[in-house]
Amino acid sequence: MVGLQPSEVPPTTVVKFLGAGTAACFADLLTFPLDTAKVRLQIQGENPGVQSVQYRGVLGTILTMVRTEGPRSPYSGLVAGLHRQMSFASIRIGLYDSVKQFYTPKGTDHSSVAIRILAGCTTGAMAVTCAQPTDVVKVRFQAMIRLGTGGERKYRGTMDAYRTIAREEGVRGLWKGTWPNITRNAIVNCAEMVTYDIIKEKLLDSHLFTDNFPCHFVSAFGAGFCATVVASPVDVVKTRYMNAPPGRYRSPLHCMLRMVAQEGPTAFYKGFMPSFLRLGSWNVMMFVTYEQLKRALMKVQVLRESPF
């Protein structure tokens, strides 16, 4: 690495792993209220006659939550969300390039679209398997108003939520919804990582952009839109199933069929706008931060290894 500029040094797997988790946490801090609004809109109508608060639109949902539950309510579940990103994004994003290289035949300069999709599915599934308990707790906190009676909080804190779910529903309760979540995140990871990878590659090959902020911004925005379109139906089913009390749904398929019967097919795109606003803005913030963090971390590494 001696004599190379930081931008010329390929980032190590450790740099990508740490950079992805840190960048994802930063993006979560800025976009978490949109994710909470998405969850509230997705579960609206799930249990007719019980819900007293009606949510309309992204901004309306956030304002209603602030008015009825307090100004901190849009950030309910943030701690679990940060737990999730450090374990989830680090794997699905940080290991993507390494897994892609593993699947690419030796002697091949470029990975095919099929190889990239396979790598995205692999890291997405690995990430869900490790991070599912954090996702369950995050969703429970975001949907807290619907649990219990009289607006009382069921969990005293994030660690108490892990313990309570394990005690009342068994350890399997912490992995509730794993299969729909694996499906959802395999789709999202493919849409995000593969789309970002391809758009960025085409922009650089066509010399429309250099490897800088505008290139990262356009690539990330396109990745966020594609991910929202293809993943929304699975995301709604995942949210409903993970938030449901024991016995409401026999399986994710039963949840999906009940949604169609009671609310129609448009239920699969409930919360689409906050999903897009969240995924679009989240992808832009995450990928831009991730690219800069990789460069900064490699610069530090080059300086440490330089003899001068």
Curated annotation (Swiss-Prot):
Which parts pass through the membrane? 11-32, 74-96, 117-133, 180-196, 214-233, 268-290
Q: Supply one GO molecular-function term.
A: oxidative phosphorylation uncoupler activity
* Swiss-Prot/TrEMBL GO biological process terms: adaptive thermogenesis; cellular response to hormone stimulus; fatty acid metabolic process; lipid hydroperoxide transport; mitochondrial transmembrane transport; proton transmembrane transport; response to activity; response to cold
* Gene3D superfamilies listed in its UniProt record: Mitochondrial carrier domain
Source organism superkingdom: Eukaryota
Tell me the residue ranges located in the Mitochondrial matrix compartment per UniProt: 33-73, 134-179, 234-267
| Topology of this chain in the membrane | Multi-pass membrane protein
Answer whether the UniProt record assigns the keyword Transmembrane helix to this protein. yes
Q: Which segments carry the region annotation Purine nucleotide binding?
A: 275-297
Q: Where is the signal peptide?
A: none
Q: Where in the cell is it found?
A: Mitochondrion inner membrane
Repeat Solcar: residue ranges? 11-102, 111-202, 211-296
Q: Any keyword Acetylation?
A: no
Oligomer status and interactors: Interacts with HAX1; the interaction is direct and calcium-dependent.
Similarity field: Belongs to the mitochondrial carrier (TC 2.A.29) family.
Function field: Putative transmembrane transporter that plays a role in mitochondrial metabolism via an as yet unclear mechanism. Originally, this mitochondrial protein was thought to act as a proton transmembrane transporter from the mitochondrial intermembrane space into the matrix, causing proton leaks through the inner mitochondrial membrane, thereby uncoupling mitochondrial membrane potential generation from ATP synthesis.
Q: What is this protein called?
A: Putative mitochondrial transporter UCP3
Q: From what organism does this protein derive?
A: Rattus norvegicus
